[in-house]
């Protein structure tokens, strides 16, 4: 760490001195500090304190002497511990040295040996402040100059007693030695052993924060946000409540010299804070109060944490800095206690400031007291900002309290994940986090300032207020901001992609936020107003002026920042639930404005929101609880910080367990989460709290930041690695995944659901809608997405039921898979509910809220996947938002997680979607039973089986068979039982709504049976299912939108296009795309799961399932589309759906072709997004289209046909998808089933409006498949219903068949109109070889494909005309045959022939009403089979 220290030193021309003095520990601190300082400087913060921290002990003492003199003066006046305090200050210097350089710890303190262990923490804390705050030995550097300015300012105030301070500093240690010896040692050993080192680090941070705070209130705003956040909030909330906080926060270190500690802590913190922030006169009263506090603190020393909180609360009234101490002490001592006490306080106050709330609990006077104190304290340094200080004082009080509460949580959150907050470490995990604390803490500094800088700018009003207000406020602001931001930042750092994506999404979300759902915005505003009103009394309007409660997004941001950076983030993130824009801004705000939101506010508010939801059952309550949550958030955060504080923490039913679980869950999570996953993600996640409740946590959440913070974790459950996604963490999720994450997820999910349910009661219906949209955007914030689903489900007990089901299943799965499952389940089932509910609510399709984490939280994880994936997500989003916000939302969310995460994640999603939806409908019990049954299979089997369980025929044939019995409608013979039963069971067992899902599921299930040895039965089942479920699907289309807890989610994905063909035209695209993804994820995942369990032997368990998954996805699309009308329309729709990526643009329109494919097909390109497509979504759609267009432009024929292709790619893409997905699924199944297979779809979907990327890969066979009647590149499919011809431009099939070579990125044009044999043969190898990057060995397949393609094309010509039914049947057949062929023939030729033969047999049974289907099916199957075989045989 010397390097970093040297950096600081060099920068300050103090390297030699520092280098010589600092030991490893000091260097470590210095290095971290230096980095943090640089970051802070970058973030427009003069945080040279970090560098100063590196200052040698002597300098530390010097600075401390001067610095401490003032502080000690305060403390002495206050607590009359002058002798103790100065000596303690010296000790602190020693401590700073100790922390910075352990040797100095001994060498730098004469009395150190005396009170070395006990006072060390205190010393460190105080000393670090001196060292960090006031290292005067670095005057050369600009930082040094700034520090000098601070010193001068401070000196001007403390020069009167600089000497006195210093000598007392020396005197104090002896006094402190006994005190610390007794109390600190006890507390230190019991809970602060780790704090001992951490406090020094935090102390340094705090002092650094405070010194700039003194010098530059604004600088402190940025620097202190992290520094103060770390120091003040971590263990140096004592900066605000030096004595109280130090005592409370570091009850052991500071409680030891309780008598002198208040002074000392006060002196140290006040030194850096009050000296710079407040006048000495103001400090004297404070010192007296602190003295009292110190007196109280010693008593609380033994309880350390509890006493800490109590003392802190008691001192807190005198100084709101106590709030941080209290909160953090509470956090440290007992999450429950904090939750009980601080939360109770918070709840009663209903303020955003946990500190204020705590004060209210401890004493209503504290609120005014801190104001008074702060006002007096602020004048000298903050007098120029006194105008604001009146507000800021209150706000600082609020801020400090909020930050204290949130700081503790943020610190907690951070300290666990980043372990940057010593206090948090000391308090919550005093022993464990301390070690980690140093790096995370400094990293937070590094990261926080940048985002806080944004955030500060964002909440310039409030942030300056924060800076301006008294040091406690500043410290709190910074501290709170820092925990959150640092966490977030760490998360973001961990998930750089998340940050990038988040920035993009932030813009989108801001767009969505402001243009998306006025109602929700209004609601959010109202909620904010209420919260602000509640906080207002505490902050005396600081929030109002700074955070303008009236302005929901911006002012909330500012308001909360006014409260404290974290608070500012909290409001935006809290309110985003109410305001999609805010969630969107929130998720991304979390990422952009600050991980603070994701971290501290997220969690604090998330937890608070959750509790508020439980208690208030309304957004306002939740927002209200924001502060309360902050107050007790530390508890939740305590457990969750490592997981996905940001995203998950938001919804924490149980403070620690639930919060932790949630944190893990979503961030994992939001997402960003996560979610910024997005990391957070943990993706992760009331606006924000509600969002978090709605699972904006990050997911992934993040929150996104959570990922980093916690894993640096992953945002929240899903977003954390970007926000908790498999890439989320379950994809790059924040969790130290595995057991903890799962538990957290479970907690979080359940709590979130409950929260959301209650939130709904609070009129969050709109919010839900908004959050649905939001979530869409913040899929990265899987938590958000989950939260959204949960919000919608909160009114549905089923949501919890599903979630539990999901959790049950997820628990069985592997840790990562579990995470993914939970996320997936969350998202899936929540999404199912959300989808339905969103449709019911018909929320404005603001895609502000989807990110995560996936972690599923935002798109971060997926974005992390290929760029195409993000594009796809926008397409999905757009479509989803347009036609069925929920549907698209869910679809896109689920697919993303699958893409981002493993099949496990995907499976859980589907699982939950299917299972949740099913239980919602009629099969809750059965689904549960199935899920449990499936749960028997651990890992993928369990996950997939569980999904299958959702689908009645999950477990291979057995569940299907029983399900067949269960579903009266199951007319498929037992041989088709697996798939048929799944379909029928779902169709028959559940109503049409359920049927829709079952279709998907059957699609999934069918592949298993079909793949293995039931292709014929499966096909008949498919045919039948197409008919019955087709009807049901249609039927369900309407209900799907209506009923909130429907199985529709999967069916919605599959049916979204079908049922919502008019209104869901766009949904069709998203549905297609989502179905595609969802099929891929939900049906595919389930399919995959069933296949995996069932076909473990037939296929390579994973490959077949994987291929089947895609295939099934296509099949599901086919079934739903084809069976909906059981017409070409359905087939067309299936096609539309099938080309999820390829059809995304086209599918947007075809999306609605489930009922009227023609219409959407017409709209496909231009009106691909039907009704309400938020500009953001539109943008995403456009972007996807652009990508597709580029490819098409490369091969202009493709581009032209892109338009006609819009209609065409759907059917064609279905074929492609069926075949293509099968191949990718099949093969990737073996390799990395979900990820691999998903990325192609992602490419397909996101890249295009036509499955060009997909086409590229599987395009060879696919394009060959379309080759039949029309040019290989174009497949003209007629919608029998509308009679409209859709030219599906298959990326690899244009009139001049243009094959896209993914490897070279070039388009190979081969004229393959009718001469499929001649033209297609040569190109297919090229196309296959080139376009099929994934399947380079496709060349043989192309030949095979060409052979079938000829048949296909021959059959296809008629098929196009009678494509509707035929294509539908063909697709189903193709799926069946495809699977059958895959199972039957691994060889390309075998594939072609068997598919042709098998397809026909399957075709007729599959679609009894579709006689002509055989031809199209043959073509499709040929491609599919070829691809599959190519994948299977060639690979």
Curated annotation (Swiss-Prot):
Biased segments, Basic and acidic residues type: 149-160, 389-402, 479-493, 522-535, 609-620, 650-667, 751-772, 1194-1211
Compositionally biased tracts (Acidic residues): 1424-1435
One Pfam family, short name: DUF4585
Modification sites for Phosphoserine: 323, 470, 816
Biased composition (Low complexity): 727-741, 1055-1066, 1083-1093
Stretches of the chain forming a coiled coil according to its record: none
Tissue expression pattern: Expressed in the heart and skeletal muscle.
Positions of modified residues (Phosphothreonine): 120
Function in brief: Plays an important role in cardiomyocyte hypertrophy via activation of the calcineurin/NFAT signaling pathway.
PANTHER family xrefs: CARDIAC-ENRICHED FHL2-INTERACTING PROTEIN, CARDIAC-ENRICHED FHL2-INTERACTING PROTEIN-RELATED
Assembly notes: Interacts with FHL2.
Name of the molecule in the record: Cardiac-enriched FHL2-interacting protein
UniProt source species: Homo sapiens (Human)
